[in-house]
Amino acid sequence: MAEIGKNVIENLTTAMYENAYTVYREYIQNSADSIDKAIAAGIVNEKDAIIDINIEYNKRRITINDNAMGIPAEMFVKKLTDIADSQKDRTKEKGFRGIGRLAGVGYCDTLIFKSSYKGENVESVIEWDGKKLRDVLADTTQHPSASDFVDDITYSYQNEANMDEHYFEVIMEGVIPESDDLLDKVAVIEYLESVAPIPFATFFIYKSKIYEFCRNNNLKIDEYTIQVNGNQLFKPYKTKIYDGTSGSTKVVDEIKDVEFKEFYASDGRRLAWMWFGISKFEQQIKPMNKMRGIRLRKENIQIGDENTLGASPKFFKEPRGNCYFVGEIYAVDSELIPNARRDYFKTNATTKEFEVEVRKVLYNELYKTYHYANQVKKAFQSQTDYERKAVEYDKKVSEAGFVDERDKEKAKKDLETAKEKAEKSVRTIELREQDANENTTLNRVFNEIKESYRPEKSNTVISVDSVKQEEKNKKEDKKYLTQNLSKYNKREQKLISKVYSILQAILPKDMADMVVAKIQEELSK
């Protein structure tokens, strides 16, 4: 008879997950399944159900507790020691392989499970010796079978409990130094805000539109009350998009609406649905915007990370494409089954069909959307640039602001070039507006960009003072900037003008203009 060795336990514990934070996800999904059953059985109200996480850095202890079903005493030991023998329904429940409960044992000295079932006056407890587990795995002279190994590192007992209590609790005692990250409350919260099945933040104004779409299409987003050290968690979606590093307040774009898509199999089954934000798509969204990218979820638990879809050429034509968007794809078909690591789905016919249908939107429609936005922005920008240069040119003419004739001719040539681009952009805008009239998504993008480039009167009208100054300059025969330096003679003005010309030749335009203006200001005193 074949014997399964100790290394199987290693593969299911210390070697199973690349990211230590996944232990939180594994225990949360088990608690969520239990809460669903408790609500269905009338044991707890949905509004009272809670998953409570407590992180105690000084004690090196993590506790994860739920007030759901609990486990009957007669089933407790078998359920908590049997491996990969879960009786859960994979089409209905989030955790179904019977291996997730082992996730924590490799990261602590002792992993403790406690539970009490409603109507029983006992608390069932089982302890897994994580330190001994690591010692045996590291000892090449010990070769116990997997079952003997489990028996050797587990210990169960019972305590008295109130018959009305019902809960399940996971305690990780003595979190090892190598796993300090698990005790970093801020980092844990940031991870769970992305991954866990929690509600949208109250300040995300489009959540009501998302919930309305779900109601109208017979869809449901699984959401649970999850706390970390007393603080309830929410998905940190925001409408404003920021630039720079964390803490920056520079707003570069804003979500103005959300769009929805549904994905169906060839036989009419709904495979998934998605929402994504509509903005001006000014630039790739920076990492400081926590929920950037289109995220993939099943039962509202994130599959993989923000790069799962973006890094795959199956879904995005360009690797950068995903970073222009904010949104989520919710897989709903029962055959879209998360793999053991929950970083993607198991390969099957439904997964293949899902990829084909999602690709049509991500690879084609979303690619077209942000490139379309770029074309529209460039066209409107060409008109804005021309208007700005025309105002600058007229102002310099009226105020004798050119350094010399060459400077004036260059500005005139630049203005003519800008005018040509602006004239060409009129046709581009007309064509893109036609596209917008045929596509609701592009229509929203077009109108948002058009509104942001609406000219202000102050940018296109020369002031009365400027006109008066121009008339005065004509009377005094002033054409160039240095002629305003009346305390210098013509020879000195000519020398200063030469310096200005050199600065314009060797410096970028903006810097040259700034330096010349500063020198002019100082010489005018």
Regions found by a protein language model. Give the residues of each.
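Glycine-rich ATP-binding loops of the HATPase_c
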Residues: 110-114
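Bergerat-fold GHKL ATPase/HATPase_c domain
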Residues: 1-51, 59, 74-81, 497-525
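Interdomain "switch/hinge" adjacent to the Bergerat
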Residues: 1-6, 38, 42-93, 119-285, ...
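Charged regulatory segments coupled to nucleotide-binding catalytic modules in large multidomain enzymes
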Residues: 249-525
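Glycine-rich phosphate-binding loop
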Residues: 89-108
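Alpha-helical scaffold elements adjacent to nucleotide-binding pockets in ATP/GTP-utilizing enzyme cores
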Residues: 24-27, 75-82, 103-107, 187-191, ...
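Short, solvent-exposed loop/turn segments at the edges of secondary structure
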Residues: 106, 163-165, 324
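Conserved phosphate/pyrophosphate-binding and hydrolysis machinery centered on Walker-type P-loop NTPases
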Residues: 17, 21, 97, 489
